[in-house]
A protein has these predicted regions:
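Short, basic (Lys/Arg/His-rich) helix/loop patches that form interaction surfaces
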Residues: 254-309, 313-316, 325
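Basic, Lys/Arg- and aromatic-enriched nucleic-acid-binding interface segment
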Residues: 134, 138-168
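Catalytic-site neighborhood detector that most strongly recognizes the C-terminal catalytic loop/helix
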Residues: 311-346
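N-terminal core-binding DNA-recognition domain of tyrosine recombinases/integrases
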Residues: 13-28, 34-126, 143-146, 224
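Active-site/catalytic core of tyrosine-dependent DNA strand-transfer enzymes
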Residues: 209-278
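Short, charged phosphate-coordinating catalytic segments
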Residues: 98-101, 161-186
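Flexible interdomain linker/hinge and immediately adjacent N-terminus
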Residues: 101-139, 197, 242-252
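Conserved tyrosine-mediated DNA breakage-rejoining catalytic core shared by Y-recombinases
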Residues: 173-215, 221-227, 231-233
Length: 370
């Protein structure tokens, strides 16, 4: 049974290079494209792309809609269908302009990978993002053991995520020198820290509790004072795996190196929430928690702008659109409160006049009568 087609492999390599070097896409995006194209090739039994016709796209859409997810065991979601087909649409649109394919494919052929308007709306609909409450996060952190250095690292890791709102990929690549306990800040330098869109910015510790900051400070002090680690050593080092007494590989302290991916961080979160008897919330959900906290504590546009910048957002609109929707329960509270008639506060003419006079005097205007 054919596992690949030589011409297909060559043109795919060109496309992946185009995505990475011309379009500037990340490795994650390129991998998503490769996965989608492979799904299609498996379905067509690796038929030459030059023999593509629109009936293949139509049949593949039906086939994909009938497939079950490997993890869930249920039908693939509309969002998964949309993401896969969008990648294929982009690939075949590009392919139609390449030498050797121009005479066989038309740009409009790629349009047959579109979902119906109804399914597209379902796939792209915005849904309320789940996030833990402040009390839940603190309960999880306080429930975590701290007897071994691995346990101390794990507890400090979740506390640090809560304190800074940093993304897991950034945390996995941070060094000790990036944390300033005097200024209560973290320098997310894109030259060394894997930030989103390679942005460089400074994050000041969010006001989530002195006990949370203290856990992070104790961890930094442990690495610097007890283990004598320096500025370029990892803030949250990887777990050392060694052969144990039972001749089985097991965790044995910490390696003096970074985690290669953020996957172990998500595992720490999953285990911590499970041990606390709470549903799993991933590291990114803490950013939603912090946005909701900001909506409560910020009293002016300037304050919320600073809060937004602290999350690495250049525009406040990003915070509102991506994270800042009003939680459903809070939405109900606001609407019910608005249904209650409220007495509008009105100033008397004398009060208004006094306010004007005060403002003029503060501005240095001479209003004395002559």
């Amino acid at each position: 049974m054919t596992k690949h087609h030589a011409d297909n492999e060559r043109i795919k390599r060109q496309y992946f290079a185009f995505l990475k070097d011309a379009k500037g896409n990340s490795e994650t995006t390129v991998d998503a494209a490769a996965k989608a194209i492979n799904r299609f090739e498996v379905y067509t039994k690796h038929r030459d792309f030059k023999l593509f016709h629109v009936e293949q796209a139509i049949a593949f859409k039906k086939h994909l809609a009938e497939q079950n997810g490997q993890r869930s065991g249920q039908k693939l979601s509309k969002a998964t269908l949309y993401a896969t087909l969008t990648q294929l649409k982009g690939f075949f649109h590009w392919l139609a302009g390449q030498p050797g394919y121009k005479s066989r494919l038309q740009y409009s052929d790629a349009e047959f990978f579109n979902l119906s308007d109804k399914d597209t709306r379902i796939a792209t609909a915005r849904r309320e993002q789940q996030a833990p409450t402040l009390a839940q996060v603190k309960y999880v952190i306080q429930s975590m053991p701290s007897g071994t250095e691995i346990e101390r690292r794990d507890r400090a890791l979740i506390a640090f995520t809560f304190l800074t709102g940093a993304r897991d990929s950034a945390i996995a690549s941070m060094k000790l020198k990036h944390v300033d306990l005097i200024a209560n800040s973290v320098d997310q330098d894109a030259r060394e820290v894997k930030t989103k869109f390679s942005k460089t910015f400074r994050t000041f510790f969010f006001p989530v509790g002195d006990e949370i900051r203290e856990m992070v400070a104790e961890w930094v002090a442990y690495l610097r004072d007890d283990k004598f680690w320096g500025n370029d050593d990892p803030l949250f080092p990887a777990t050392r795996i060694a052969l144990g007494a039972t001749r089985q590989f097991e965790a044995s302290g910490l390696e003096r190196e970074h985690w290669s991916t953020a996957s172990p961080i998500r595992t720490v979160f999953r285990d911590a929430f499970a041990s606390a008897g709470l549903p799993y919330f991933n590291p990114h959900s803490f950013r939603n928690t912090l946005v909701r906290l900001g909506q409560d504590v910020c009293k002016s546009p300037e304050e919320f702008k600073a809060w937004s910048q602290n999350l690495g957002h250049e525009q406040v609109l990003t915070t509102f659109l991506s994270y800042g929707e009003v939680a459903c329960q809070r939405q109900g509270e606001i609407i019910r409160a608005l249904a209650t008639p409220q007495q509008a506060a009105q100033s008397s003419p004398d009060e208004f006049a006094d306010a004007v006079v005060k403002r003029l005097r503060n501005s240095g205007v001479d209003i004395s009568t002559k």
